[in-house]
């Protein structure tokens, strides 16, 4: 039984989340999306990322009853895709003629972050992030960003204007 439990735990992607206990979720009905902070991406790449992930975020927010308001939103939603090189590995590859040469591998590490900020107080009310590399390796979908966004929003269980978390908002 323990082995089965460990197997299922290792198959689900790890989502790290924060929720502000003092936030008044009953007052949140509208939102506005700020474009991804993308210092590391070119303008073309940034637009492509935004265009791919934004519809999934809009779906999740509208499923919770939130409406878009560009003038006076209750919350500001910001998302970011973070990546960089990690763990350079040196390997000495030999051949039959005893000539050795170094081989350096740089793995690309990435994460997706979504956060909601109260537009009046400017305080963070919710934040969720996921290791995109591990999640994307395990997925067979056409666009794995959808599943990533769903995993992130499975930690935000608030309908618009309702301070009580609703477990039925989780998607499996």
Task: Please place each PLM-identified region on the residue numbering.
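A structural "domain/chain start" motif
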Residues: 9-64, 72-73, 161-172
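Glycine/charge-rich catalytic "coupling/switch" loops of P-loop NTPases
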Residues: 69
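Sec/Tat-exported extracytoplasmic proteins
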Residues: 57-65, 81, 85, 120, ...
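Short secondary-structure boundary motifs at beta->alpha junctions and helix caps
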Residues: 120-159
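Soluble non-cytosolic domains of exported or imported proteins
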Residues: 44-55, 104-107, 139-147
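Surface-exposed short loop/turn segments
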Residues: 64, 75-125, 131-134
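Sec-dependent bacterial lipoprotein signal peptides
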Residues: 1-11
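A general structural signal for short secondary-structure boundary/capping elements
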Residues: 78-80, 123-124, 157-163, 172
């Amino acid at each position: 039984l323990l082995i089965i439990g460990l197997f299922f735990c290792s198959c689900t992607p790890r989502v790290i989340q924060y929720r502000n206990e003092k936030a008044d979720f009953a007052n949140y009905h509208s939102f506005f999306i700020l474009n991804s902070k993308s210092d590391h991406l070119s303008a073309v790449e940034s637009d492509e990322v935004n265009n791919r992930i934004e519809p999934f975020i809009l779906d999740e927010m509208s499923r919770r009853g939130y409406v878009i308001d560009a003038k006076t939103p209750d919350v500001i939603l910001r998302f970011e895709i973070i990546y960089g090189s990690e763990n350079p590995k040196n390997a000495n590859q030999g051949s039959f003629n005893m000539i050795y040469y170094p081989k350096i591998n740089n793995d690309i590490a990435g994460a997706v972050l979504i956060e909601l900020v109260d537009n009046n107080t400017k305080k963070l009310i919710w934040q969720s992030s996921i290791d995109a590399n591990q999640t994307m390796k395990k997925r067979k979908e056409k666009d794995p960003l959808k599943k990533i966004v769903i995993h992130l929003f499975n930690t935000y269980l608030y309908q618009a204007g309702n301070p009580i978390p609703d477990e039925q908002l989780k998607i499996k």
